[in-house]
Amino acid sequence: MSKFTFENMSYWESSSKYILSFPEIRFVGVVNNMGNLVIGDYKKGIIPIAEIDQYKMCMEHALELFMKKDLDSTLGPLDYIVSKRKNVAIITIPVRDYLVLISTEPDAKIEPIIEEILQSLNDIQQVKRI
């Protein structure tokens, strides 16, 4: 099995553009297992309400859960985490050794967005990488 990477940019760009096409999406990025942003894009015209370093603080909890596999055998693997705040909702989706970080408008209907994004990310993982 090939390691899932975002080095093949055409796949990332395709998925990123698709995710950013949702009206409620503000930002999409990929965080590695060290908590560093590997790549990310804001929707055109969006003014960030937080610096990338502030998003990293939100990732601490998500990374901790992602790295803890203790409950996988009984509860199953982690599908995603949603953190809702007054000004933004943050969706964290584990994809192999990475976390996809997505911020949305706070009033977004999260479940339909997540289902579409999960399908998009599943499609991208099925593509054979060299």
Locations of regions flagged by a protein language model:
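Non-catalytic interaction/Regulatory regions outside core domains
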Residues: 1-130
